[in-house]
Design a protein with these regions (language model features):
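Alpha/beta enzyme core
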Residues: 3-242, 248-251, 255-256
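A short, charged, Gly/Pro-tolerant segment at domain boundaries
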Residues: 270-287
């Protein structure tokens, strides 16, 4: 399979069904988010059943900040390259859909599907006017409905993971956030979302309430110090993402190694790198 070979519709539909089934397994679907073809291939080789992108990592890798500073065209091009590099399903972080109108979201979804992805993360944040702010439930539900219609027209059972930033953006008073999240989740699922992503919360009490109150698979985002995959599994979490954490770790290593060689003239930071033959071998079959 060449990195220039497009994914056929039949293959894409099969991967979409596989990806959907991964949300109903005995263990949560764990997604160590990637940001370019190389990281995606490494994640696949490590044993990931699917590859998810991180918008922050993608943006940084292309020289842009997070928050829809990247154009739709650049984002879709990157997704196509990731899809062509791996053999597992790919789900794309499309932020808020790259545009203010529901028609913009539909256009982005069509582009992502043309690139071969089988899932999207679509958030209710708005990055316009210096944001981010959180859109109204009604407005974002309409955007999700537009995404669903676009996917249905293509004929791919796209997995729409509706992200709500109520906790991440500290919307309202703390005591109101659970109900606000549950109300948004219900509206988003009714509009066509297949799963709900609630970043910014990992405590067991809230996570358990979210699992019980949302009629769709729950996705949480983890960071150092968060509960383990097994602990989340015991509470019914269906999907676990790491967001930009791996990209951040890689860039931290880059800075540490650069500072070491530039200041002390030593190279100990390089010691745990993957070997040239191993890395090169990951991509030889794509030639």
């Amino acid at each position: 399979m060449s990195n220039e070979t497009p994914t056929t519709l039949a293959t894409q539909i099969e991967r979409a069904r596989t990806f959907r089934d991964l949300h109903a397994g005995e263990r949560p679907l764990v997604l160590p988010n990637a940001w370019d073809p190389a990281s995606a291939r490494v994640v696949e080789e490590a044993g990931a059943a699917a590859v998810a992108t991180t918008s922050a990592g993608v943006g940084w890798g292309l020289g842009f900040g997070d928050g829809e500073r990247l154009s739709r065209e650049r984002a879709v091009e990157l997704i196509a390259r990731v899809v062509a590099t791996v053999d597992v399903p790919v789900t794309a972080d499309i932020e808020a859909g790259y545009g203010e109108g529901a028609e913009d979201v539909a256009a982005t979804v069509r582009g992502v599907l043309a690139a071969g992805a089988v899932g999207v993360n679509l958030e209710d944040a708005s990055h316009a006017a210096g944001g981010p702010t959180v859109r109204s439930t009604e407005e974002n539900a309409a955007r999700i409905a537009a995404a669903r219609q676009a996917a249905d027209e293509v004929g791919v059972p796209l997995f729409i993971n509706a992200r709500t930033d109520v906790y991440l953006a500290s919307v309202g008073e703390p005591e109101t956030r659970l109900n606000e999240t549950l109300e948004r989740a219900a509206a988003y699922v009714a509009a066509g979302a297949d799963g709900v992503f609630v970043p910014g919360v990992v405590d067991f009490e809230t996570v358990t309430a979210l699992v019980k109150g949302i009629e769709a698979p729950l996705n949480v985002m983890v960071w150092p110090g968060a509960p383990s995959v097994e602990e989340f599994a015991e509470r019914g979490v269906a999907r676990i993402s790491v967001g930009a954490a791996i990209a951040q770790s890689v860039h931290a290593l880059t800075r540490r190694a650069a500072r070491e060689v530039l200041t002390s003239g030593t190279y100990t930071s390089f010691a745990e790198g993957l070997s040239y033959p191993e890395l090169n071998g990951l991509f030889e079959r794509r030639a």
